[in-house]
């Protein structure tokens, strides 16, 4: 099967140097899902266009013309440019830490190359919202993303009715089954009390701007992030541990 040219958007997940001037880039594309591309000549001197390598930083959203052959594991990019030019994510240490957490979480969930345009648009929109977010929204953003991403992988906890849980007394979220109840699960994989109540509140957040109203302290966010990592490990095969999580826990004070 010969290669054909296609125009697609993509989110950069990983970039690895190759040879003297090239990179191999893992990109989640709108048209083809998870793909790897060889990009030549982007690491030469700045005078010769070396700055092009900056376009392939993790979380970058690109507009591309790509060669595609479904039988090849490594294709090539003919043209590329930023689809959205970030104002803060690539330069602000805290927003960059959140973005890298989101990139790693998505990468760990993607096991097959199949396209999912809804997942692509959800993720791209999330990065753009993060770039524009206030400090409070940014601090809660990893929790929001971690709870809403699972809808695309079949294990998201259902939205509880607003006000369904008036207090946190004896409230549990079963991380294995993904359900809330007032009965303690018969296994150790659950969160309870305020953690379960706040999780229910976060699940009802439909627009990131609503995160402004959820006031949490640094330690509580860290506890929830740890619990959500366990949640993913229970549902995603070979999930392992998040390398970006320790950095994120320290930065989001």
How would you label these PLM feature ranges?
Residues 1-253:
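Non-catalytic alpha-helical scaffolds and adjoining flexible linkers that form interface surfaces
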